[in-house]
C-alpha cells in the first residue's frame, strides 16, 4: 500500500488536486465520506475533532459542521451538495461559516471521484478556488498538512475497521 498522497497545486487553474488509495472496498470509503457518524470519526486533523450539526446528503442538501479544537474553539463550515452519483462521484461547494450557518465567501468547489480497484479504492479530489488569493491563503494556513493529517485519520480508521 502507498501511504503517501499525491498533492498538487496548480495556480494557473486555481485548483488543488489530491489523489490517494485506500486498502478498503469502495462501499466503506464512500460511506466514510458521506455518512456524518463516520465523517465525525476522522474529518479533522488531530487533536481537533469534527462535529456535524446536520447533514442531508442529497443534491441541494448540506453538511453544516465544526472542527473543534482541544480548547473548545469551533471553526464552522458548510458544504452544499451540487451533484451525486452514488459510489462514483460527488461535488459540493465548501465555505467557512459562522455558527449560524452563514457562509463566508469566497468558497471552493470540491469534486470527489471514487474508483473501485477490487480490494482497494482510489479517490481523486479536485478543489477549485474562486480566486488565486483564496487558494494561496488556504495553502498558507496549512491546508496541505492539515488535510493530509485528516486523510491519515481516515486511512487508520479504514485499516482498523471490523467487518460486519
For every predicted segment, state its role.
Residues 99-145:
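Beta-strand/loop substructures that line and gate deep hydrophobic ligand-binding cavities in soluble
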Residues 13-19, 26, 62, 76, ...:
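Intrinsic-disorder/low-complexity, polar/charged segments enriched in Ser/Thr/Lys/Arg/Asp/Glu/Gln
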Residues 158-164:
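Short, highly charged C-terminal tails/helix-capping segments
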Residues 29, 39, 63, 81, ...:
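Hydrophobic pocket/interface hotspot
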Residues 17, 37-74:
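Short beta-edge strand/loop motif at the mouth of beta-sheet-based domains
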Residues 1-49:
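Hydrophobic ligand-binding cavity/cleft-lining segments
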Residues 26-27, 56-58, 82-89, 113-122:
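A short, structured loop/turn motif at beta-sheet edges
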Residues 18-20, 52-53, 77-83, 108-115:
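Hydrophobic/aromatic beta-strand elements that line small-molecule binding cavities or substrate pockets
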Amino acid at each position: 500500500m502507498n501511504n503517501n498522497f499525491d498533492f498538487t497545486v496548480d495556480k494557473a487553474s486555481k485548483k488543488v488536486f489530491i489523489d490517494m488509495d485506500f486498502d478498503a472496498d469502495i462501499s466503506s470509503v464512500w460511506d466514510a465520506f458521506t455518512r456524518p457518524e463516520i465523517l465525525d470519526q476522522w474529518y479533522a486533523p488531530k487533536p481537533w475533532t469534527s462535529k456535524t450539526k446536520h447533514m442531508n446528503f442529497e443534491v441541494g442538501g448540506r453538511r453544516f459542521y465544526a472542527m473543534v479544537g482541544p480548547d473548545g474553539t469551533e471553526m464552522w463550515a458548510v458544504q452544499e451538495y451540487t451533484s451525486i452519483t452514488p459510489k462514483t462521484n460527488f461535488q459540493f461547494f465548501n465555505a467557512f461559516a459562522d455558527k449560524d450557518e452563514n457562509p463566508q465567501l469566497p468558497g471552493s468547489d470540491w469534486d470527489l471521484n471514487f474508483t473501485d480497484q477490487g480490494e482497494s479504492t482510489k479517490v481523486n479530489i479536485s478543489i477549485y478556488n474562486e480566486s488565486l488569493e483564496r487558494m494561496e491563503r488556504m495553502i498558507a494556513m496549512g491546508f496541505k498538512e492539515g488535510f493530509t493529517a485528516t486523510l491519515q485519520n481516515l486511512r487508520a480508521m479504514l485499516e482498523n475497521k471490523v467487518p460486519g
